[in-house]
Amino acid sequence: MMTDPISDMLTRIRNAQLALHKDVAIPYSKIKYSIANILKEEGYINELTLNNGTITLYFKYYKGKAAIEGLRRISKSGRRVYVSTHDIPSVQNGLGICILSTSIGVIGCNKARCSKVGGELLCEVW
């Protein structure tokens, strides 16, 4: 039984990129699809497809290195982390992004700062 589907998604992405796979399949849920869309908008993945209840992410590589260097789950099922607009962290001195679940949906940290909303800090990507 899976207790944290977002952690499972991040682990699948991390493991697939370490094995230099060109894509990874993840079971569909609305929040995972939203996170995948943010990764595509921010340029961390090439393409994103949805078919038969599965999200397929196609990775970006530059000279054999993955575009995503690291992923980290922040808010976990045992310890939720909430931030206000002013407390949204800078990831890797601005070279990464954080993803938040807010009242306006799942968004990246830059959009959250512009929209002046806080929320649950889901994960960091760099």
Curated annotation (Swiss-Prot):
Gene Ontology process terms (BP): translation
Top-level taxon: Bacteria
Gene3D superfamilies associated with the record: 3.30.1370.30, 3.30.1490.10
Record keywords: Ribonucleoprotein, Ribosomal protein, RNA-binding, rRNA-binding
Cellular compartments per GO CC: ribonucleoprotein complex; ribosome
GO molecular function (one): rRNA binding
InterPro entries documented for this protein: Ribosomal_uS8, Ribosomal_uS8_CS, Ribosomal_uS8_sf
Subunit structure comment from the entry: Part of the 30S ribosomal subunit. Contacts proteins S5 and S12.
Record PANTHER family: 40S RIBOSOMAL PROTEIN S15A (PTHR11758)
Function: One of the primary rRNA binding proteins, it binds directly to 16S rRNA central domain where it helps coordinate assembly of the platform of the 30S subunit.
Stated family: Belongs to the universal ribosomal protein uS8 family.
Protein name: Small ribosomal subunit protein uS8
Gene source species: Lawsonia intracellularis (strain PHE/MN1-00)
